[in-house]
From Swiss-Prot:
Protein's name according to its UniProt entry: GTP cyclohydrolase-2
Cofactor, how bound (note): Binds 1 zinc ion per subunit.
Cofactor: Zn(2+)
Native organism: Campylobacter fetus subsp. fetus (strain 82-40)
Catalytic activity field: GTP + 4 H2O = 2,5-diamino-6-hydroxy-4-(5-phosphoribosylamino)-pyrimidine + formate + 2 phosphate + 3 H(+)
PANTHER family: 3,4-DIHYDROXY-2-BUTANONE 4-PHOSPHATE SYNTHASE, GTP CYCLOHYDROLASE II-RELATED
Family listed: Belongs to the GTP cyclohydrolase II family.
Gene: ribA
Pathway: Cofactor biosynthesis; riboflavin biosynthesis; 5-amino-6-(D-ribitylamino)uracil from GTP: step 1/4
Residue numbers binding Zn(2+): 53, 64, 66
Taxonomic lineage: Bacteria, Pseudomonadati, Campylobacterota, Epsilonproteobacteria, Campylobacterales
Length: 195
């Protein structure tokens, strides 16, 4: 599959001054890297892989912790250096329309995994080959991965993962069950639900 790369541009944001570079995968998926202007790829780089969540990232949905994780990651990268890789994989890669349908099923009592299965999808449809491509493109060989997701830890093949940096957000009344399912059924490393 052909991947087209953009130039690098500056991006001042409310979280700090960053640079950005975009990658177009095939005809449709455009991913974004947000990184420190002084990124040193000869050292271990702090990396967050964040999958798009329009309802959380843009609208502030309380049904997930996506926006809070993204904002915490950008603050961390601003302070410590590194990169956020923003993947266009809405709804764990089932797309926005199917995600809304999954939300409707959840409104009727199914959990996030049951809803995906009801729609004919796996619990998590995401893949991370593009992340390997991006890390290679930057020349990054060693990372600290900001994640709670064991699938992300297991999926990266082109780099050495020095350590996992947890990025936990306290649950609320709307996402507590969702996060508990991620912990109990998907193996997410969430300390709140181990106490």
């Amino acid at each position: 599959m052909e991947i087209i790369k953009s130039n690098i541009a500056n991006l001042p944001s409310r979280f700090g001054k960053f640079q950005i570079k975009s990658y177009k995968e095939g005809c449709c998926k455009e991913h974004l890297t947000i990184f420190s202007p002084n990124l040193d790829v000869t050292k271990t780089v702090n990396v967050r892989i964040h999958s798009e969540c329009l309802t959380g990232d843009a609208i502030g949905s309380l049904k997930c912790d996506c926006r809070d994780q993204l904002e915490a990651s950008l603050k961390y990268i601003n302070k410590h250096g590194g990169m956020v890789i923003y993947l266009r994989q809405e709804g764990r890669n089932i797309g926005l329309l199917n995600k809304v349908n999954a939300y409707a099923l959840q409104d009727n009592g199914l959990d996030t995994i049951e809803a995906n299965h009801q729609l004919g999808f796996k619990a998590d449809e995401r893949t991370y080959e593009i992340v390997d491509f991006i890390l290679k493109d930057f020349g990054i060989k060693s990372i600290n991965l900001l994640t709670n997701n064991p699938l992300k830890l297991a999926s990266l093949t082109c780099v050495n993962i020095e350590k996992r940096i947890p990025i936990e957000i306290e649950s609320n009344e709307f996402n507590k069950d969702y996060l508990k399912v991620k912990k109990e059924q998907m193996g997410h490393m969430l300390d709140e639900f181990t106490r």
